[in-house]
Swiss-Prot record:
Gene3D superfamilies per the UniProt record, alphabetical: Cell division topological specificity factor MinE (3.30.1070.10)
InterPro entries found in the cross-reference section: MinE, MinE_sf
Protein family according to the UniProt entry: Belongs to the MinE family.
One Pfam family recorded for the sequence: MinE
GO biological process entries: cell division; regulation of division septum assembly
Name the UniProt record assigns to this protein: Cell division topological specificity factor
Lineage: Bacteria, Pseudomonadati, Pseudomonadota, Gammaproteobacteria, Alteromonadales
Annotated S-S bridges: none
Keyword terms of this UniProt record: Cell cycle, Cell division
The protein's role, per its UniProt record: Prevents the cell division inhibition by proteins MinC and MinD at internal division sites while permitting inhibition at polar sites. This ensures cell division at the proper site by restricting the formation of a division septum at the midpoint of the long axis of the cell.
Amino acid sequence: MSLLDYFKSKKKPNTAVTAKERLQIIVAHQRGERDAPDYFPQMKQEIIEVIKKYVHIDPDQVTVQLDQNDDKLSVLELNVTLPEEK
């Protein structure tokens, strides 16, 4: 029986580590929103509306992120979870 317990004990997820990782993602996302330009929320909404013209999506499944480097370079990252085709 102790051999089976040995294998079972290694598979338990550490919830504290998982919670910490999720919190770090949320904090990083909120920091990015603070530094975004004033027009960014409207631009994000318009991008979602254009996508919805062609594909039925859930707006919560769309992430738009603007990364700005010190080299005056801006990168607009768009991630859309598309529905599976039937």
